[in-house]
């Protein structure tokens, strides 16, 4: 359809469906319509078959409405793929996507298609052609993408659930930013027939809901999983290191999960882990992905390397599928998308093969960690949703922080669910639960079991609006430091790191907190983090002897022997009687004479 229209015009069409009944649709031709929060691109009705006569049970999704991202095929309709040029250059679909058909056949009614990022490639939710959907949770901030409209449709209560596609966070990010549930299933668990591909080795059909029971019911239809008895998790593993660099306090994120777990299953189920260290030890192919190595030690964190692998795979596979169309049409793109697709990209076949090895090894590692009844807990996103029109998504640091967390499930192919936990500083807060590849039904069951208690604990953690703090930030920081010291004495290194991190969040210019956390990192063998913390401590206090000694120790373990000797010597300048610094400096001096 190639007709011109006035800014407020819409087109109503009645077409045959080929599923059941008929559908009526209306295309939004401009971004002027905002009564639907800008979520919908098409209004339509895909009607389910008539309900069976009693005493037969009704269809499992009867009375539920849903929307779909405009990346799924609908018979007789051209999906936009987030860009008007795509619709202009493609023919209408000859059939409806398998996932959509399955849901309609199960009794749900599809009422529309929703806005996606251009070419479904971004995670911001912004679209310069069809408009950026309004985030109902924080209207002055982006909704997250790529499945922005689908998330907004659920968050604004227009539908009971919606479908999106998650490649590198396309469902998980908007769920986190809009404060709703978002499920990314195991890779390959749901049919991709009738979906425009972004990156075939990363793409999954995902879905949003507010109600965990609805999320689960939809999952049972899409996953076609056989019935099994519901099982409680045997282990809930907190990835403590992933929570340490958030701007949200731990008592609003990981501590909420810990308290809910203790209440439901008991303390014995809980386990803490440094996930980066685990990945570094289990995914050997990551070493080949590092461009900066010293004595075999990675200078880039394992999660950042995973993010690089994910970006390379996504870009490589996207170009393999769509490069001809891109070169002919030359579509006008949002800067955040253009920056990723137009920057110079060269990757060898060897690098792609190594990326595939990383993917295989990571899946084995995560499956081995979680087994059949384990759950890994991580933050969904590293930062709150940026303000509309902000430049954060153009920042390499922002992208790296976000994609590092998102790469875990994308690369391993494991299933992940975003769980909202209220608000902090007026922005939605969420965590994510990950289960092994193929553990989708178990994860949906676990979410349903935990959801109410998680919300209760999140409410308890949120301060009352009428309450006033009677303890200063500095005092609270000191309390956290003392708790960290006690945990360190008890040889609970990861727990100590958590408390020192809390102290740093409350008072970020105290050298002692960084130096103490560095010592705990040394005990865990996390030498890069220890070196970084010591350097920060020294920047605040250039006479901090312990920081110099601890940095020297970290550098020695990393193989930076000259720098280590310099640190030990400077510690002796500050404290000539320091026997440990003297012996360390002498040992290295003799070694390299």
From Swiss-Prot:
Key words of the record: Chloroplast, Membrane, Plastid, Plastid outer membrane, Protein transport, Repeat, TPR repeat, Transmembrane, Transmembrane helix, Transport
GO BP of this protein: protein transport
Record InterPro entries: Amidase_dom, AS_sf, TPR-like_helical_dom_sf, TPR_2, TPR_rpt
Protein name: Translocon at the outer membrane of chloroplasts 64
Keyword NADP (UniProt): no
SMART domains per the UniProt record, alphabetical: TPR
UniProt-annotated location(s): Plastid, Chloroplast outer membrane
Membrane topology term: Multi-pass membrane protein
Parts of the chain on the Chloroplast intermembrane side: 1-4, 166-403
């Amino acid at each position: 359809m190639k007709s011109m229209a006035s800014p407020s015009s819409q087109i109503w069409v009645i077409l045959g469906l080929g599923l059941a009944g008929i559908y009526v649709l209306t295309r939004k031709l401009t971004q002027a319509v905002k009564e639907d929060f800008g979520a919908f691109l098409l209004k339509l009705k895909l009607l389910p078959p008539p309900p069976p006569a009693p005493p037969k049970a009704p269809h499992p999704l009867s009375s539920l409405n849903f929307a779909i991202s405009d990346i799924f095929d609908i018979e007789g309709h051209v999906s936009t793929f987030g860009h008007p040029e795509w619709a202009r250059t493609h023919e209408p679909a000859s059939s409806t996507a398998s996932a959509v058909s399955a849901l309609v056949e199960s009794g749900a009614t599809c009422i529309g298609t929703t806005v996606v990022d251009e070419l479904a490639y971004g995670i911001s939710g912004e679209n310069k052609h069809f408009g950026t959907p309004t985030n109902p949770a924080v209207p002055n901030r982006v909704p997250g993408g790529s499945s922005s409209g689908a998330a907004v449709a659920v968050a604004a209560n227009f539908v009971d659930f919606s479908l999106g596609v998650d490649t590198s966070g396309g469902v998980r990010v908007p769920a986190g930013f809009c404060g709703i549930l978002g499920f990314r299933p195991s890779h390959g668990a749901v049919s991709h027939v009738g979906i425009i591909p972004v990156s075939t080795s990363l793409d999954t059909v995902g879905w949003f809901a507010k109600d965990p029971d609805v999320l689960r019911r939809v999952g049972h239809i899409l996953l076609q999983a056989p019935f099994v008895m519901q099982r409680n998790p045997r282990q809930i593993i907190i990835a403590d290191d992933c929570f340490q660099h958030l701007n949200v306090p731990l008592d609003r994120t990981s501590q909420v999960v810990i308290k809910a777990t203790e209440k439901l299953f008991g303390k014995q189920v809980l386990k803490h882990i440094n996930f980066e260290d685990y990945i570094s030890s289990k995914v050997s192919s990551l070493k080949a992905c590092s461009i900066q190595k010293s004595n075999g030690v990675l200078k880039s964190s394992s999660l950042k390397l995973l993010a690089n692998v994910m970006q390379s795979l996504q870009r490589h596979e996207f170009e393999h599928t769509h490069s001809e169309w891109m070169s002919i049409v030359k579509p006008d793109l949002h800067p955040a998308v253009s920056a990723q697709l137009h920057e110079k990209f060269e990757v060898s076949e060897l690098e792609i093969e190594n990326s595939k090895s990383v993917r295989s090894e990571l899946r084995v590692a995560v499956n081995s960690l979680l087994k059949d009844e384990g759950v890994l807990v991580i933050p969904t996103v590293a930062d709150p949703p940026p303000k509309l029109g902000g430049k954060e998504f153009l920042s390499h640091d922002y992208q790296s922080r976000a994609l590092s967390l998102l790469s875990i499930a994308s690369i391993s192919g494991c299933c992940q669910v975003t769980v909202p936990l209220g608000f902090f500083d007026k922005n939605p807060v969420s965590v994510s639960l990950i289960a092994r590849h193929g553990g989708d039904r178990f994860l949906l069951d676990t979410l349903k079991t935990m959801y109410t208690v998680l919300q209760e604990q999140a409410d308890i953690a949120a301060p009352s609006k009428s309450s006033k703090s009677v303890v200063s930030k500095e005092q609270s920081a000191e309390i956290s430091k003392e708790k960290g010291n006690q945990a360190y004495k008890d040889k609970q290194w990861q727990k100590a790191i958590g408390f020192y991190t809390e102290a740093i969040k409350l008072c970020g210019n105290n050298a002692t907190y960084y130096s103490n956390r560095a010592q705990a990192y040394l005990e865990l063998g996390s030498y890069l983090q220890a070196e970084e913390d010591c350097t920060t401590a020294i920047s605040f206090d250039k006479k901090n002897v312990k920081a110099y000694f601890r940095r020297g120790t970290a550098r020695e373990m990393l193989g930076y022997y000259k720098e280590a000797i310099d640190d030990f010597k400077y510690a002796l300048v500050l404290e000539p009687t320091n026997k440990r610094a003297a012996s360390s400096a002498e040992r290295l001096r003799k070694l390299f004479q």
